[in-house]
Amino acid sequence: MKSIVAIVGRPNVGKSTLFNRIVGERRAIVDDMPGVTRDRNYAVVERYDKPFILVDTGGFEPVTEDRMLQQMREQSLLAMEEADVILFLMDAKQGLTPADNEVASMLRRVDKPVFYVVNKVDGEKVENEAAEFYALGIDNMHTISAAHNRGIRDLLDEIMALLPDEPLPGEDEVTNIAVVGRPNVGKSSLVNRLLGFERVVANPVAGTTRDSVDTFFTCNKKRYCLIDTAGIRRKGKTSQKLEKYSVVDALKSIERADVALIVLNAEDGITEQDKHIAGYVYEAGRACVFVVNKWDTLEKDNKTIGKFVEQIQYEFKFLAFAPIVFVSARTGQRIHKVMEEAAEVAEQYSRRVTTSELNRVFKEAVEAHHAPLHHARRVKFYFATQVGVKPPTFAIFTNQPDGVLTPYQRYLGNRFRDAFGFKGTPFRLLFRGRERKTADGRERKLSKQ
């Protein structure tokens, strides 16, 4: 496991801005509304050849009656517990607050390195005012401006000095799994059930998860990163600026994923939004599993599952290869099947086929059904080879790449899927012209007809 560095502090002190500054890209949503980051947000960062996991947390309010703020406080406590190093961030412009004193008092009892960091120090006047934070009884304080990249390098240098020179043992390749779906279909509840503890703030209010939240975990000796995304609405439905950020972030999470768990609500059936979301997954070329949640709420007979499967396969013809799991995140019904299917489709997503086996199937397909003539010329095929994975990608060499029309491409694709399965994963066929040699031995590419 990599070392973990957690950023904690009151709401709206600039934790997400600092997180984004260190990561080097806009990963957490930044907005002036307190409580924007509700869950822990993870990113892998490497500096001086030392990789570590940076954690952004929701605002920490030591005493509050607000249920959401209480849940955010619990998430911050979990982050502090799992961290190797803690960055306690405060706000120079707001000054030292009673809540800061409460958090500092709690951190004094923590047996791990704590960096006391005062943010929003944008000038000499503010620098002088920041001296009041020494009243916390600390010996060393860092003054920074995350928004203007002031003092960040020195802070990072001190952090890196505390981290191991070599990655800790047990680092394996991580499979990224994005949990996607409409708002309030139970994505966060599903994540919490899969992980076995309340990793993500689960709340019945639609749109609770605003950021895409990463969680690293191990299942059957394999490493995974589970990405809980904000609910994706259609463009016309995203009125608030913050919600638009969340939708964009969710789409980016699909791009980062190897596998997408497309969560459907059994109570609602299949909606147009569900089809749009599945379309995003298909266009991104990701492996996927349909997870039909809230299955416990339906009255069922021995034909209910069959009818639902038929409906999914009809509405999502373009993802007909995806397995379907019927679960209840609330009761835990069949939850174990989700990771079983996700692990299997992830393996298929990275699968390689031997060249000999590939060409045997390819030759049989071509001999069984020749490609139509193109511009009165016969389309000749030479050989096929696998050129990539995630998804599996095959190059097919022919005398007329443009002459292999869509119906014949589908035919070859169906023959490949019949032979190799590729459960839960798309694959790509690339048609390329083969190079020929001229009389003097030089190679030339076939001209396209």
Curated annotation (Swiss-Prot):
Keywords: GTP-binding, Nucleotide-binding, Repeat, Ribosome biogenesis. InterPro entries: G_ENGA, GTP-bd, GTPase_Der, KH_dom-like, KH_dom-like_a/b, P-loop_NTPase, Small_GTP-bd. This is GTPase Der. The keyword GTP-binding applies. One of its GO terms (biological process) is ribosome biogenesis. Associates with the 50S ribosomal subunit. The keyword DNA-binding does not apply. Residues 351-435 form the KH-like domain. GO terms for molecular function: GTP binding; ribosome binding. GTPase that plays an essential role in the late steps of ribosome biogenesis. It comes from Trichlorobacter lovleyi (strain ATCC BAA-1151 / DSM 17278 / SZ) (Geobacter lovleyi). Gene3D superfamilies: 3.30.300.20, P-loop containing nucleotide triphosphate hydrolases (3.40.50.300). Residues 3-167, 175-350 form the EngA-type G domain.
